[in-house]
């Protein structure tokens, strides 16, 4: 196991299943967490509120890492017409605003968009995708291009934007309710009161995934919290976990297949968009979310406010 992978595993345990020494470290780092909290809270004030004349929905979470934001955004796009996704485009090799997709046409490369944005671009029900560090510019561009609804991926902390805030709450909670670096929260937990709707897994949405068993496949993934795929680990001959947003190299994947005498890569769609041009046989792990009536009706009510 590489040093990078060991660090990822250590960090995962530190936030969710800490041992005695990791718990001690969390308390030692509390003064830094207080300082971080001060600046994080300060950053949410003193900015003019920006209001749009069309629906803007944000899907986010308080803790760092994957909680299912991408499949939930895609689920919203399947339920409502004319949805554009606006996101930062983490780990992309570009800066500024890029239109990744417009009206079912992909307009840039994976390097320019980042893996998450390109995953959205391949979703038929998502009509447009825009990456921009400045979410306000991204929203304006989306509406210029004909968006009926803008969904923001991971923008809960953008309190200067008037929007319908959906805060995801996973079944798997951090061990401590501390913020970084003592815990995994990016803002104090009391900030969840600022959400318009707290979406609880099992109550407001159902998460499910599917892939057929294939012992000629090697499971590789570079998503946050790969333990979410635990039910599929036994369906492949071997499993390898990489850092979130990791850029796969063709040679290393070839070596993994040869090592285990396999001919197929088993991966999520987010991983697939990064290897699709390598020529490997791939088997996609379908990760989906189904909205329950409680959340669906809240979104419908919000959208209807703009039809009056």
UniProtKB/Swiss-Prot annotation:
Protein keywords: ATP-binding, Kinase, Lipid A biosynthesis, Lipid biosynthesis, Lipid metabolism, Nucleotide-binding, Transferase
Protein name, as recorded: Tetraacyldisaccharide 4'-kinase
EC number of this enzyme: 2.7.1.130
Origin organism lineage: Bacteria, Pseudomonadati, Campylobacterota, Epsilonproteobacteria, Campylobacterales
Pathway(s) this gene product operates in, as recorded in its UniProt entry: Glycolipid biosynthesis; lipid IV(A) biosynthesis; lipid IV(A) from (3R)-3-hydroxytetradecanoyl-[acyl-carrier-protein] and UDP-N-acetyl-alpha-D-glucosamine: step 6/6
Gene assigned in the entry: lpxK
One GO term describing the cellular component: plasma membrane
PANTHER family on file: TETRAACYLDISACCHARIDE 4'-KINASE, TETRAACYLDISACCHARIDE 4'-KINASE, MITOCHONDRIAL-RELATED
Described purpose of this protein according to its UniProt entry: Transfers the gamma-phosphate of ATP to the 4'-position of a tetraacyldisaccharide 1-phosphate intermediate (termed DS-1-P) to form tetraacyldisaccharide 1,4'-bis-phosphate (lipid IVA).
Major enzyme class: transferase
UniProt catalytic activity: a lipid A disaccharide + ATP = a lipid IVA + ADP + H(+)
Molecular functions (GO terms): ATP binding; tetraacyldisaccharide 4'-kinase activity
């Amino acid at each position: 196991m590489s040093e990078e992978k060991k660090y990822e595993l250590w960090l995962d345990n530190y936030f969710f299943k800490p041992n005695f020494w990791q718990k001690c470290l969390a308390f030692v780092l509390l003064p830094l967490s207080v300082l971080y909290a001060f600046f994080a809270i300060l950053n949410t004030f003193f900015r003019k509120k920006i209001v749009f004349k069309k629906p803007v929905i944000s899907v986010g979470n308080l803790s760092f890492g994957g909680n299912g934001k991408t499949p939930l955004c895609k689920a919203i796009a399947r339920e409502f017409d004319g949805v554009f996704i606006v996101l930062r485009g983490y780990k992309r090799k570009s800066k500024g605003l890029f239109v990744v997709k417009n009206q079912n046409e992909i307009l840039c490369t994976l390097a320019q968009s980042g893996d998450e944005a390109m995953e959205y671009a391949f979703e038929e029900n998502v009509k447009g995708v825009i990456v921009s560090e400045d979410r306000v510019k991204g929203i304006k561009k989306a509406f210029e291009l004909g968006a009926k609804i803008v969904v923001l991926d991971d923008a809960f902390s953008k309190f200067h934007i008037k929007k319908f805030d959906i805060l995801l709450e996973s079944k798997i909670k951090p061990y401590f309710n501390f913020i970084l670096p003592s815990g995994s929260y990016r803002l104090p937990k009391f900030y969840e009161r600022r959400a318009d709707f707290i979406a609880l897994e099992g109550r407001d949405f159902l998460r499910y995934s599917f892939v057929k068993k294939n012992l000629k496949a090697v499971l590789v993934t570079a998503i946050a919290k790969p333990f979410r795929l635990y039910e599929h680990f036994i369906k492949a001959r071997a499993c390898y976990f990489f850092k979130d947003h990791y850029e796969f190299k063709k040679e290393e994947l070839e070596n993994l297949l040869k090592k285990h005498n396999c001919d197929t890569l088993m991966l999520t769609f987010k991983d697939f968009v990064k290897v699709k041009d390598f020529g490997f046989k791939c088997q996609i792990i379908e990760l989906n979310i189904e909205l329950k009536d409680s959340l669906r009706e809240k979104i419908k009510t919000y959208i209807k406010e703009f039809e009056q």
